[in-house]
Amino acid sequence: MARGPTLRASPILVLGGFLIGAEAYGPLVASLERLSGGPVVLMPVSRLDWLLTLFPFGWARLLDRVAPLAAELAARSPSGRITMVGHSSGGILLRLFLADGPFEGRRYSGRCLADTLVMLGSPHTALKATAMRARVARELPGAFFASAESDPVRYVAVAGAIDLAEEAGQASATARRLAPTAYRNSTGDPADRGDGLVPVESALLEGAEAVVLEGVAHGGAFGPVWYGTPAVVERWWAAVASPAGGAASGAA
């Protein structure tokens, strides 16, 4: 992407979730553009790209593409830094992108480029976490750079909570089928509260600002209302746009 003129509002870079196509994020991107007044760029990721993240080199392969895009947007930002939004696994990947330490022979130091990281339904903790998620939790615990002396990052963790009962109309058949096992693997409680895939407890990150949204599912496959639904984007973006430091909750 060629460098353009300096923008009036800080740009936003969005990294979606595991195996979720770009078309799912169209309403989210459009809503953020309207609400923020700045450009919003969705990182292009193929199904193959996501499948390769089962291995460390697959994470590096994706972050190698995030880095130049983030740098170009930051160069045009009035503040010199951008907001990053990660949905599901995308939020975990972006936590790693912020780090200064070596990863697969690279150093990303993304915190020099991003001053805010918003994580939507990201599975930060789990009893049965994948090796890479466990590594991020171990090496970069909590809101790791929130209190850094230089280039601190504001972390905002957004969690959804749906009623799995069919009559509630919040959860799809897929969510009702998968949630008990997914919750058990994360917190040990199959009846936990969550977005149909990720329990609230797992989606909230120690040290991050917390936003819990009732009636919000993990994705379109898990319920009719999810983090990318325009009305829901308005709710979590209001928390991001407000002064840092507060927690929020509410119905979708």
Predicted segments, located by residue:
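Lipid deacylating catalytic domains
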Residues: 2-252
